[in-house]
Design a protein with these regions (language model features):
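Short amphipathic alpha-helical face segments that pack within enzyme cores
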Residues: 71, 75, 112-115
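Short beta-strand scaffold segments in enzyme catalytic cores
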Residues: 42-51
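Glycine/charged-rich beta-loop-alpha catalytic/anionic-binding loops adjacent to active sites
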Residues: 53-62, 91-98
Length: 154
């Protein structure tokens, strides 16, 4: 038997250390949390993504009693894909809000969202992932970094 160690590089920033482009996405993601419909979890997730063509899309999680809701990340991703099919996603910012404040630690996307974004990376274009907490912000170079043992071929 052999053992393999898998690591992921995460860069940690404060808001003031971000580029203006990254700040814009974080601000839009924070605003998007207020569009969340989350009466069951009371956990609002907002996302903002930028395409390579400069277009920006926002999304917020939408719940329902059947638990077949959609996450904020995928809401933004699918809206962008419907309007601009084939245009690569450059970066996405994600943040969460609960109990009347933004979460302290950055929130990572669920497995379904990770897989969805990986599908959009199949064109060989990594998507920068910005996870914004109240003060701390994590940045990853690609969604592949969130799922090192992922599958993208069927």
């Amino acid at each position: 038997m052999t053992e393999k160690k898998i690591t992921t590089k995460v860069r940690v920033y404060s808001y003031n250390e971000l580029t203006e482009e990254q700040k814009k996405l974080v601000d839009l993601a924070r605003e998007a949390t207020m569009n969340s419909y989350s009466p069951y979890s009371n956990f609002k997730v907002g996302a903002a993504l930028e395409l390579d063509n400069g277009e920006v899309f926002i999304g917020a999680n939408q719940e329902n009693a059947a638990f077949a809701g959609i996450c904020g990340e995928r809401a933004a991703l699918y809206a962008a894909g419907a309007k601009y099919p084939g245009v690569p996603v450059k970066s996405v910012a994600i943040t969460s809000f609960t109990r009347d404040e933004f979460v302290v630690e950055p929130t990572a996307p669920c497995g379904v969202c990770r897989q969805a974004f990986l599908e959009f990376e199949k064109n060989g274009h990594p998507i920068e992932l910005i996870l914004a907490g109240k003060e701390k912000i994590y940045i990853l170079d690609s969604f592949q970094d969130t799922m090192p043992l992922s599958f993208t071929e069927f």
